[in-house]
């Protein structure tokens, strides 16, 4: 019997985002450490690392209230975060391609000489390093595209979807505010300040 293959880092990230989208709830780390292994097959030991990577990439929001951190995710925000990441990676890849082309030209000029020169050796090393960097960037671009093959098209067509999602989350936020007032006795303006909720926060028409 073959050994069961573990989840890749990207699979863990995708499955953890599914928890937020499917439940539309707010979690503490200890909640995720119970739910993620049971429902998504993410090992308990890796939950904190995966969750932090999603926070770092802007896919998941985190707010500290009292002594605890609370985590939640907005569907529309995730789409825009992926779009921004793709734009950055595409820009870096484009710059890398231009540098690569310029170095190729420089090496061709260096080859005209009859003997190996120090300049040619240096250019060859730089070209090799740049080639490796370019391949890494290409791989990362593809990773983000593979995470959701239709992400670019979704972003173009997401206005209505994002509006509906935002209004659903508006419901959730109002529910969370009510819960926080009951649970912690917080005043509404303090909750708004902690969560960065603007005074004119309301449903989108």
Swiss-Prot record:
- Say which family it is in: Belongs to the MND1 family.
Q: Which SUPFAM superfamilies does this entry report, sorted A to Z?
A: Winged helix' DNA-binding domain
Q: Which UniProt keywords apply?
A: Acetylation, Coiled coil, DNA recombination, DNA-binding, Meiosis, Nucleus
Pfam entry (one): Mnd1
- Where, subcellularly, is it found? Nucleus
This chain belongs to the protein called Meiotic nuclear division protein 1 homolog
Quick one: which gene encodes this?
MND1
Q: Which organism is it from?
A: Bos taurus (Bovine)
Q: Does the keyword Nucleus apply?
A: yes
Q: How does it assemble?
A: Heterodimer with PSMC3IP/HOP2. MND1-PSMC3IP interacts with DMC1 and RAD51 and binds preferentially to dsDNA.
InterPro entries per the UniProt record, alphabetical: LZ3wCH, Mnd1, Mnd1_HTH, WH_DNA-bd_sf
Quick check: keyword Transport in the entry? no
Q: Which GO terms describe its biological process?
A: reciprocal meiotic recombination
Mind naming one GO cellular-component term on file for this protein? Answer: nucleus
